[in-house]
Structure formats: structure tokens, C-alpha cells
Amino acid sequence: MFLLASAQKDLSMCSFRLFGLQKPKEKEVWSTEVTDEDFKNAIKDEYGVKYSKDWKRLLKAPIGLKGKYSIREGVKVVGNDAFQGCGFLTNIDLPESLTSIGRNAFWGCDSLTSIIIPNGVTSIGDHAFSKCNSLKSIIIPDSVTSIGNYAFLCCDSLTSINIPDGVTSIGECAFYNCNSLTSINIPDSVTSIGYHAFSDCDSLTSINIPNGVTSIGDCAFENCHSLTSINIPDGVTSIGDCAFSSCYSLTSINIPNSVTSIGYYAFKWCKSLMSINIPDSVTSIGNGAFSDCKSLLNINIPNGVTSIGDSVFVNCNSLISITIPSSVIAIGMNPFRGCHADLKNESKAFIYEHNVLFDRDKTAIISYRAKEANYVIPDSVISIGGFAFSECNSLTSIIIPDSVTSIGDFAFSGCDSLTSINIPNGVTNIGQGAFKNCGSLSPQVKSDIIQRFGGRSLL
């Protein structure tokens, strides 16, 4: 009896302790999605703004809402599209209880001049403040960890913004076309800068990319015409396509030793860029990467680069010299068109003689850089590469041997002095625009080309 009583006593104490434990409170999750059911059960305040029946979610404001509006304290979420198109809204107070701002929440509120996002908000949704054309200032709290795609797109009046510590990613087009933005602070917590994140920020003069960033997205700073300097930190491994394209005021840039690839058109039309250092870590240079950099005087291609893309140095007409290093095994369509630099070749994968660049076996012409009026293509050549003779204005006649079977895209485009050319019967393919803007070719020659290969070769 004693043992049983003791056991019962122990069991009772154990049971008390067990049932006395409290289950941890789960974190509340509030959705920014608004459904038909939400609208069906919605309640309105005196301004006609719709809320969920528990007053936790703001669902939709009437498009005619004017002046200043204060969201009720206790609201957790501003739903997707909540104030979209409220063009007469000039000021809004967000409650301290707020945690999320939904997609398109204030899209097109073009009279809104300033906004303070309360501490507690963790995410700013896609397009949240897109096209708020009068927005001059915004305070983003330390609690925010992500800025959505297109979040501040076309905020024309925004002059500066501080991105708080804690934000790890800046979304696609987040500040696209914020053309009054002169300065921006990107914290060390950011690891990626998205596609078009700051493109067309025409007043941005300088920017510091933090050490945590490993990739610079495609077109991230495209058309930042006033950008004069930029620091790319160690740790960045790739520079995206068009990343700094048309940064007209950029005079110099240092690429760190961590970068392995330079994307297509990465520095195209950086017309003030005079020098650039490409580190030994780079293995590939994308198509058009430095095209139209008209002030570029010097550039080194390090031994380690294996491929040079199409049109990489097109119209770099101030460039003094270029050396193709021994590591290069692939070269795209005429990278040197419109570039008058002295060319030196150290690669065994190519032959450079008499100012003409061939492949190893002289079966393909890559770039014709001579100034002669007449040229006879060697009998070993099978193909004429894209843009190979493009814009050779001194060329008046050319003889193509019977060995040639293909003529690449735009191969002779812009040869406006060319009057004589033969196309052998063995040629089976002529690329688009192969003879575009060859204004001195006779109508008969053009007619023969069209009859054999179609009008595409002249367009």
C-alpha cells in the first residue's frame, strides 16, 4: 500500500509538472495577400479605408483618398495594392505595430513627399513605392532585412537614402531611374546587388560597394551618367552584363583579384574611362565589354584569360596597344573593329601577319586591320568571320578564293569604298548584313547577291 501510494504521489507530482508546462507561443504571421473573402468580410473606417475584421490588416484605400492619413495602431500589415494609385495622398503615418508592407502598396502615390517606416517592419515588398514621383525622403529602420524588386522604381525626387545594417539583398530594379539620387549608403550586410538595381540613377556621383558583396548584377549601374568613381571590393567574383554600361563620367576603375569574369558590355560607352586594371584572376572577357570606351589609353589582358568575346574593343580609338596573351584560345567576332591600337599576338592559337588576324591554321579570318586598298584572301581560308572587314573604309576591292564557303554576319558592313568583290560558287552561306552600308557596290553586284542569298545579306 505504501509503495502504491508513493507511486501515485510521484505520478501526481509528475503529472502536475508535465501539464503545468506552457507551450511556446508561436510567432504570428500576417499575409500581405488580399482575397475576395477578405473583402467580403472587410470593415471600413470613416475614410472608406477597408480593414480586416480584426483590424490587423489594412486591405484597400479608396483611390480618392486625399491629404494626410494615419493608419490605426495595431495594424500589422499593409496589404498588396492597398494604396495603389492614390494620387492625392500627401502624407501617411504608419503605426509602430506594422511588420510588413505589401507588393504595390503605395505604387503611383505621386503626391506622397515623405515617409517614415516604423521599426518592426522587416520587409518592403516588390513595387512598394514605385512611381512615388514626389517622394523626397524615406527612413528605413534597422529591422528591414530585404528590399523588394522595383521597391523605389522611378522615385524621381528621392535625393538620398540610407539602407540600414541588416539588409542582405537589394532587389532587381530597386532604385531604377531614381534620377535625383545623389548618394546612397550600402551597408556591409549586403551580399548581392540585383539586376538594374541602380540603373538610370543619373545624379549618382559615387558609390561604395561593401566588402560582403560577391556579385554585381546585370545592368546594376547602367546609365549612371554622373558616376565618377566606384570601389569594387575583394570578394566580388563576377561583374554582370552591362553592369557599368554608359557610365559616361567614370574615369578609372580597379577590378579586384577575386573577379574571374567580366560580363557582356560591362563597361560599354564608359567614354571617359582612361585606364583599367584587369587582374590575373580574370579568365573571360564578355562580348563588347569595353566597346566605345573612346578615352581608354591602356589596358592589359592578363595571362590567364582564355577567351575574348565579340567586339570587346570596338571603337576604342584612343587605345595605344593591345597584346593577346598566350593563354587565349578563343576570340569572338572581330574584337578590334574601329580600334587602331598596335596589336601583338603571343597566342599559338592564332596567327597575326600583315595586320590580319587568322586562326591557327589560317582557315578563318578574324580581323582585317590593314589599310591597303586591295586585298587577296589566302587560299587556305574557308570562312570569313563576323565583322572581319567591317568599316575598312580604305578597302576598294577584294578577291575571295574558291576555298571560302561562308561569310559571317556584317563581315564587310560599312566598307563604303568597296567597289569590287567576287563571291565564289562554293560560298553557301552569307550572314545577315554582310554587305550592309557598302554604298559603292554597283547595283548589279547587289542584285546578284540578293538573287543568290536573299536581301538579308544587305540589311
Each predicted region: which residue ranges?
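Structural signature of tandem-repeat unit edges
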Residues: 2-5, 14-50, 56, 61-77, ...
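Consensus positions within tandem repeat domains that build extended binding/scaffold surfaces
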Residues: 80-81, 102-107, 125-128, 148-153, ...
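Active-site beta-strand termini and strand-to-loop segments that position acidic
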Residues: 359
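Trp/Tyr-centric glycan-recognition "aromatic platform" motifs on solvent-exposed beta-strand/loop surfaces
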Residues: 365
